[in-house]
Every structure is written in structure tokens, then in C-alpha cells.
Amino acid sequence: MQMILFKMNQQHYLIAAETVEEVVDTVQITKVPLAPLWVKGLINLRGTVLTVISLAQLVGLPESKTNRNIMIMKKDDERRGLLIDEVIEVMDVDPDDIQLSEDQAALYFTGVVDLGEQTIADVIDVNDKIF
């Protein structure tokens, strides 16, 4: 399966390429009063208003200081932006290489993939918690 490898907070993550519509440069994010901390706010992307979320804050990690991109994810008819530092590459991952990990925040990750060279990537589950 094709997956997108990206970096956030010096950690690597994988997300199914079929769930990603595009990656754009970070634009001005309008804060939403009383929204959860992981909801960074709203953006206007070519006339469409999208919610932008912080995966780091969603799973309790420190907020990244270098969010340079917003990954636009889609599920059914909904779209959300995910703050990331950078896309590294699109790669093929054998589903059998995804190892389940009880240490992960199971609501957001399906497992981990060993990419070699001391790099382990968490596999993001685009589910109802993100959408």
C-alpha cells in the first residue's frame, strides 16, 4: 500500500496516501474560541474553510515549533488539515510490516513500521477521532 512518510517533532509518521488530498504551505490559521487544544483553528483554502488539527497535541506530545506544511486529509466528503513539519517521501509499505504496538495511543495509530537506520514510524489511523 502507498503511504506518505512525514516528520513532526523529530518523529516519523506514516499515513495512507489514499487519505491525503494534498500538502500545502502553512497559511494563517484563525483560532476558534472554546475549541479543544488540538484544534488549532480554521483556514481558508481556495474558498473552502477547513479545520486544522495538531496531531502532537491530540496525542499529548509537545507542540512542534516548525510546522511548515498542512496535510489536507479526506474521509468520505470531509476534509481536515493536519499540521506537519515536512513530507519526506511517498513509499510502498507491505501491510504485513505494520507491527501492532500496545504502547501507542490506539485511538490514533494502527501500529509502527521499522524503516531501518534506527527509524520507526507510527502509522496514523484516519478515523472518527480525527474526523
Where are these regions (language model features)?
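An acidic, low-aromatic, low-complexity terminal/linker signal
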Residues: 1-131
